[in-house]
Amino acid sequence: MVDKVEPFWKKNIHTREIPEGKIKFDIIIVGGGPAGCASACYAAKEGYKVLLLEKDEYPRDKICGDAVGGKALKHLEELKILDTLKKSPHYVFDSVLFSNTKNEEVCIKINDPNAVGYVYPRINFDWILFNEATKRIENNEGYVIQNFRVKNILIDKQENNRIIGIKGTKEDKEYEFLAPLTIGAGGVNCPISKAIITDIYKESFIEKKHWSSAFRQYWKNVKNINYEKGAIEFHYIDGVIPGYFWIFPIGENTCNVGLGITLDDLKNKEKKLKELQNYIITEKFATRFEDASLIENSGKSWQLPLGSPRRTKLKLRRMFGNGCLLVGDSASLVDPFTGEGIGNALLSAKIAIKHYKQNENNFNLECGEKYQKEIWDLLGKELSNSFKIQKYTRKKWLINWFIGKAKRKPELQKILSESLTSKEAQRQLTSPWILFKNLVF
């Protein structure tokens, strides 16, 4: 009898012993998810000595919709990680299915073969990124510390509130680390982003219309799904709009099933997320779930800081301080329409290291402002269009009309297909005249 081999993503990731004394690094990265690992890989590529701090210990799960779009895959290929990812279980999606409250469906094909996406369970996706980051950091004389709790952000008030490092603990032992740049990559509740936004600049950390709440479960044997390759699904349902319900296959007869809605809208719902999900599965989608089984303890909720534009000089939520940058969810860069955040997380990691390389001798507020401006220049149109589409989906009559028309009108399907990969097509999709022309005539 052959022993069953334990999947690699369930194994521990071993790191070097923690250095004693006050060691100075080139860059401290707080957070070992995709944004932090990508930042570390880009930094190691430039030869920087990096300290990566992660509050949990791998293997660990991360609550997410699990979709990884074409933008993220391009960065992973650039970092030479994509081939490793392809060897782990995943689902390839080449289309997106939308349905409305009238049960009308339209399936939009992604015609660009380079833009197809994957659905990866985050437990193995993040493991691969963290393992790669660990190897590259340690090869460059850097360190990775798991189970580390950041307790204090070290701020030099005489140097215009410059962040110079962090203090924290591991197993009740205190440590202090210094670096000319600290990168906040700790997700929605990143201590670095809270220090910058709340403590130093006294700005709003949570803005309910720019903040989404989501709930996820894993189910086996949901009906009407090709578990090898096909569509991810977005469903607009009475009682859930302006939120949406999703079904994302991940392979091996398993789906990531969940729903998301902004905090501003959730407060008006009688049911909370878990109750809403139960209502959808047992009443609206009962036939598709009649033979399905819920994976025990997989139901979890989380929050997403959205990259919807603000009416401020910075356009987006602040993502820099003196001697400090924010990346990924810590920088509030989640797509306002789809809820996908990994692509923008990896992009922001690359841009952060690029700006540090240009100003490594004196990374000040002006450098941080240039970083945020470049992020806006690269993502502003895309995020603005996504925010407009999110606002359109708040109107049930418009969703029903739009999906009904798209089902019958090839020209509208073409715009939708191109909008999945093209900024110009996204602009067309949010143009009132083009929408009016396609919907009415």
Predicted regions and their residues:
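C-terminal helical "tail/cap" subdomain of flavin- and related membrane-associated enzymes
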Residues: K354-F441
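Conserved N-terminal glycine-rich FAD pyrophosphate-binding loop of Rossmann-like flavoproteins
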Residues: E57-E77
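Predominantly flavin-linked oxidoreductase catalytic cores and closely associated redox partners
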Residues: E132-D291
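Extreme N-terminal leader/targeting segments of oxidoreductases
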Residues: M1-I27, Y42-Y48
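Glycine-rich FAD pyrophosphate-binding loop
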Residues: I28, A44-C64
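A conserved beta-strand/loop capping segment in the N-terminal third of enzymes
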Residues: K71-L73, E77-W127
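FAD/FMN-dependent oxidoreductases across multiple families
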Residues: D265-Y356, N361-F363
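Glycine-rich Rossmann-fold phosphate-binding loop(s) that bind the pyrophosphate
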Residues: G31-G33
